[in-house]
């Protein structure tokens, strides 16, 4: 018995805010895990890096080993309590887009749901421009839409290898944050009967 919900969305879509508010309202006691944070902790323990920025420079084989180690750890945790896994479906690199969760990792995690938070490119661009605390790449609306399209494609690939259901939650300025939060709470509350 395990219940894993992967939540993803490109920077500026409102994923962190929606996640935080949904966790306050759900009946299930989820453990929120950021996949990248856990990978970084493992890399520091192994003496591979000192700073988060060094992670991208590790050889691909070492990164894959870290991903598998973290996936196994999360899979074990999910036997005790439901997991909400915050991660990137795709990662924009200077050379192209990288899948955030390779085949072996998604098979190990075996998620129940893959939730994608989306908004219009103009909304995302506006949020990024207003959020001066974050150092984000400047992208055009077309590039933002391409990234969201690739996230959907990645989610389909992940679902094919895990039988997860895909849920797309739209976080539009006019729709309201409240509706997006309620949609996520509905998904999270499904975990209650799994751990009863």
UniProtKB/Swiss-Prot annotation:
Gene3D superfamilies: P-loop containing nucleotide triphosphate hydrolases. It comes from the Archaea. Its main location: cytoplasm. ATP binds at residues 9-17. GO terms for cellular component: cytoplasm. The keyword Methyltransferase does not apply. It catalyses: AMP + ATP = 2 ADP. GO terms for molecular function: adenylate kinase activity; ATP binding. Pfam families: AAA_17. Keywords: ATP-binding, Cytoplasm, Kinase, Nucleotide-binding, Transferase. Its EC number is 2.7.4.3. It is found in: Cytoplasm. It is an enzyme of class 2 (transferase). Belongs to the archaeal adenylate kinase family. This is Adenylate kinase.
């Amino acid at each position: 018995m395990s219940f894993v919900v992967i939540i993803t969305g490109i920077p500026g879509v409102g994923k962190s805010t929606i996640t935080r508010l949904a966790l306050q309202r759900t009946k299930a006691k989820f453990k929120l895990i950021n996949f990248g944070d856990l990978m970084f902790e493992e890399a520091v323990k192994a003496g591979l890096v000192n700073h988060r920025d060094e992670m991208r420079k590790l050889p691909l084989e070492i990164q894959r080993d870290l991903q598998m180690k973290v996936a196994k750890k999360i899979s074990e945790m999910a036997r005790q309590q439901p997991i909400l896994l915050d991660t990137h479906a795709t990662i924009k690199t200077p050379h192209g887009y990288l899948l955030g969760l390779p085949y072996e990792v998604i098979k190990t995690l075996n998620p129940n749901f893959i939730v994608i938070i989306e908004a219009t490119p103009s909304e995302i661009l506006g949020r990024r421009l207003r959020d001066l605390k974050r150092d984000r790449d400047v992208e055009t609306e077309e590039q933002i839409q391409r990234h969201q399209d690739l996230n959907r494609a990645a989610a389909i690939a992940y679902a094919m290898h895990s039988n997860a259901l895909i849920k797309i939650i739209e976080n539009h300025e006019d729709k309201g944050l409240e509706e997006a939060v309620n949609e996520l709470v509905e998904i999270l509350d499904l975990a209650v009967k799994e751990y009863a």
